[in-house]
């Protein structure tokens, strides 16, 4: 069998499958090359987090790409729901970085500073404030 394709996508996870879908919608003939079944490797093991702000301790150019990816995710979730009826339960929640000593607190404040300079919402909560929202967190959190 000798098929001809416009594009070959290596990997049939969430990203590869999404790219293949949108290319096919635009009229491209697409092949997905996957060693197992669709979404059986990294996509299967992923926690489902879009932790753009949790990935880097210092500014990294990949941060901008990750932010763009996060920005289009609500649209992708809506398209998936519309076309398949699958609701992935997308929610925008945020993430905590926890400090248990002054060095960790300073590191978090540094991260918060550069993230705010990029326009991200990032702010410091005291241990008491965090425990109001998450009461089972340790008293050692400052």
Q: Model features per residue range: what roles?
A:
Residues 5-32:
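N-terminal Rossmann-like FAD-binding beta1-loop-alpha1 element of flavoenzymes
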Residues 24-46:
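Glycine-rich FAD pyrophosphate-binding loop
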Residues 1-2, 90:
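Short, flexible hinge/linker loops that cap or flank conserved catalytic cores
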Residues 138-142:
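Short, intrinsically disordered, charge-balanced linker/junction segments flanking boundaries
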């Amino acid at each position: 069998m000798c098929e001809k394709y416009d594009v070959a996508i290596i990997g049939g996870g969430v990203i590869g499958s999404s790219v293949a879908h949108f290319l096919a919608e635009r009229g491209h003939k697409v092949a997905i090359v996957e060693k197992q079944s669709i979404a059986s490797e990294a996509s299967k093991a992923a926690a489902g987090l879009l932790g753009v702000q949790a990935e880097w301790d210092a500014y990294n150019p990949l941060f901008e790409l990750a932010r763009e990816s996060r920005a289009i995710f609500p649209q992708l979730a809506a398209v998936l729901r519309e076309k398949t009826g699958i609701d992935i339960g997308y929610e925008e929640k945020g993430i905590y970085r926890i400090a248990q000593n002054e060095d960790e607190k300073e590191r978090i404040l540094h991260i918060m500073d550069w993230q705010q300079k990029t326009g991200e919402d990032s702010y410091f909560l005291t241990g008491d404030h965090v425990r109001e929202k998450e009461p089972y967190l340790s008293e050692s959190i400052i």
